[in-house]
Swiss-Prot record:
Residues 312-352, 353-393, 394-434, 432-474, 738-778, 830-868, 869-910, 911-951, 970-1011 form the EGF-like domain. This is Pro-epidermal growth factor. The gene is EGF. Residues 1067-1080 have a biased composition (Basic and acidic residues). SMART domains: EGF, EGF_CA, LY.
Amino acid sequence: MLLFLIILLPVVFKFSFVSLSVLQGWDCSEGSSSGKGNSTCVGPEPFLIFSHGGSIFRIDLDGTNYEQLVADAGVSVIMDFHYYKERLYWVDLERQLLQRVFLNGTRQETVCNIEKNVSGMAINWINEELIWSNQQEGIITVTDMKGNNSRVLLSALKYPANVAIDPVERFIFWSSEVAGSLHRADLNGVEVKILLETSERITAVSLDVLDKRLFWIQNNRDGSNSYICSCNYDGGSVHFNKHLTQHSLFAMSLFGDRIFYSTWKKKTIWIANKRKDMVRINLNPSFVPPGGTKVVHPLLQPKAESDAWAPGQKLCLRKGNCTGSVCEQDSKSHLCTCAEGYTLSPDGKHCEDVNECAFWNHGCTLGCENIPGSYYCTCPVGFILLPDGKRCHQLISCPSNTSKCSHDCVLTSDGPICFCPEGSVLETDGKTCSGCSSPDNGGCSQLCLPLSPVSWECGCFPGYDLQLDKKSCAASGPQPFLLFANSQDIRHVRFDGTDYGSLLSQQMGMVFALDHDPVENKIYFAHTALKWIERANMDGSQRERLIEEAVDVPEGLAIDWIDRKFYWTDRGKALIEGSDLNGKHREIIIKEEVSQPRGIAVHPMAKRLFWTDMGINPRIESSSLQGIGRRVIASSDLVWPSGITIDYLTDKLYWCDAKQSVIEMANLDGSKRQRLAQNDVGHPFAIAVFEDHVWFSDWTMPSVIRVNKRTGKNRVRLRGSMLKPSSLVVVHPLAKPGSDPCLHQNGGCEHICKERFGSAQCLCREGFVKAPDGKMCLALNGHQIPPAVGSEADLSNQVTPLDVLSRNRGSEDNSTESQHMLVAEIMVSDNDDCGPIRCGTWGQCVSEGENATCQCLKGFTGDGKLCSDINECGTSTTVCPPTSSKCINTEGGYVCQCSEGYRGDGIHCLDIDECQLGIHTCGENATCTNTEGNYTCMCAGTLSEPGQMCPDSTPPSVLMEDGRYSVRNSYQECPPSYDGYCLYNGVCMYIEAVDRYACNCVFGYVGERCQHRDLKWELRHAGQGRQRQVTVVAVCVVALVLLLLLGLWGAHCYRTKKLPSKNLKNPYEESSREVSRPTDSEAGMASCPQPWFVVIKEHQNLRNGSQSMALKDSEAADVSQFSSRETGSVQLPSRRNEPQVYMGAEQGCCIPPSSDKGPGPHGMQWGFHLPSCEAQPIALGVEKSQSLLSANPILQQRASDLPHQKKLTQ
């Protein structure tokens, strides 16, 4: 029967996003459990009970724990519960029975027979009474919880139908369906009052015992329209929610801000917000309409204040081992009663443990050990305890494990019996062991704490609270929620499907990679179509591009919230890169032996990276954060390993294979690999884990699926207008342990910030108290402390990222349509009402009674059966300006890729003013002029090429004192959050024209954030630098040469002054001796350099030629001997009669001049040999020449022919 219901009657939940519910933080009340240590009081999760097709089911509001409580309940549309007795009561109208069962589905029993025509029932949980109405007889009857002592409370009523009571206010309410009226009386049956009368039918009533309001369902007479109405307990302040729904409403229940109601026509159960007129959840049992519906939670049955014990009556003192159900108050006698295993102390105030082992009635065959409230049997070495927990048997192992025992088998006289290790017990199947020493961890979701060899209890890690089932652990603090990339937008949704909406949707193109930073509360995501990586606040504001260049196909991204870095995979470039959270210090982590990386996860505590590779050698790999120490985690039985995540509490690795449709898990080193789910997971892309569940996205049926992280069971599918749900992120202070929000802006606290379980708690200094916002501090100043102000902040009251988002959107009137129209649907099975119609991934099936059609998603079109993508770029309408951008079609949308010289947001492209932003390449002395999509450079009124240098006559006018480019207009400064945004001393400014933040860069840097070097500028200035270097080198060489020449000239002057003292001989005698030995002088010419000598030349006019022709040949020959190899001479030009001196510099030994021919008949040469073998440059004046002539008669004779008015000059 149960299998039949699961297959044919799937239950479907539909949700849309809501504001905060009262579930975020409950006050500690009776029935709620308190956490350990300093954790706050935590209430249990509410769940729903409803009747359906002759059975009664229960299910959590998030779609999990869907169970059948009663298989054969009959026609049971009337039901109620007693929370503190943990009982469910219902009326079987067909058998005329009042029945009950425990809330866990055990111990079903009949309470009593009941009359016909019972139309309503309610439980007085304070007075322990049952109240029901009989529409046919017009009476309301009261009885005790066992069906005894019945009495008529009210009679002579007009068709009383539905009944509701508030035992705290001591009121009973009922409706008259025929008369269309509402009534009220006290619980004594007096003070009857008519609250409302209408001509329409009233089909259901329910109470909000917290807000003290009465709700009812009102239908028009033909049943076409239904709506929910409410009023206060006096019948005033009536509110009609006519636009809540158009379906035929039937049953109703309330909890907090939500209304649970069932419908006839749609055969569904919905949840709506009772104040905002918005539908929230849809339960879809396909064929049979649901009956009674009740939400179960202790807040729905509060205790009355008058029920509190008097000081002298509060006798039950809880201390020591007196916890949980050990001490119980008897509601009538106000005395303490003790649980099994305890006895009341003599003073009647305490419960004391009973030592069962001392009374010899324990039944143990060999040994007994007492523990508080119980005992257990023990066995000596060599014996094992049989499954009955009493008998010991010698350990004789079975020859073969034919019984398929999960642990081991022992041979007994009754045959082979399975037994379990110490700390575990045998399950009812007789084969499986359960306990701390068994694979199921004793059923505990986190910690299993042994109490005895056969008993244990479950515990939780710090920051988690044990739930009422004493097995599951839930994170304390705010409600967690999911962030996921949906290709064309980023969405958020709570685990129960509420608060479902779009976070970022403005022309996202294609986004697959996503992660969340819990410290700064920002999201990081990568655009596959636009090819950049950016971040934004949780409300979608302050979007910043971090990585814009050299990005191809980024499909995975992970934040290191401890070391403040992020890493991403690029499947197109086949590498893994990393950067700090501001986009600085980008580096390649993995580039060798990687083919198609996709998913990536980081373990900050272990300092390791984990990623998936979908390439030719599919595998799961790991490395250090620097890319070294690579290790293969898994390489076998993989095809397309896609998403990967880490359970930081248990150090387990989870991944999914998109091709094989499997979910797997293993230790961080790859050991203990286990397949968690298979075949029913579709095409998984990404995966996330938190608390007891693993979430993964599915592309086959666009949705998000959840399974138990240990067993892979209890699968729930969450869907709703999804395109391609990709990366998944759980947002909660404990989702990424070790994060300290106090590190960023002091956690938002004015005075003191204290981190506790990933949340920031604000404290105030002495003399101050916290303001109601929990962040600011108020001075006492002798005034009374404001209400709701304390010194510590409860985790349950912490402001979450989604809280801020909800408040911001609640205050906005221009919320997008998609944010209001998104509706999520939770499916317990994959079956729906669409039957054979399959809409594919681009459409969603919508059932209307017997018909079902495909409703295409936004950006797609279809014929009711199939949907296809609309190519916006191929339409006649120009969606992207062709002059400034290029249109790129994506699934369900498009993006505008800006051309060079433009910048945009994926829709609009605006011209970049390169001149203002300082990203042009005009020369230092050039004037930059912005143009559409480009710019021009002016050099003294003449156009020049970008990068060309202008003459120095045009001084630069765009450089400020700090080395930055000046701008023509004044701009707003960037907010403090942009500190460090501009790199390399750039200045951040806000440009209103493009609605962007930009950087004013210093010379040599360009880019949006001044992150790139200006290569053209560097090359240009490098060329100028080389020219300057060559000039400097040339100047240095010239200077050195000049210094060398100056040194030589100084040495020459010095030796010239020293020459007279060293050279005392008569120069004529020396020269006459050399003249008499011409042969020797010629022989010596080869080894000695030419000596210094003087040649006196005279050139006369032709009119005086007789004198020169009168010379004898012998005399001419004698003179010609002094003219050989002259290096210096004095010429006496005949035309200007000015002697000239030519000086030589060769030194060595004394060499007589060789004979050489003179200049001919027009002149003659006179040579004077300097007699010093160390000849230095000397000057010969007139006096010196006369002395030489006087010493030589021949020279004197020949010199007499020269004109006497001619002067010798140097």
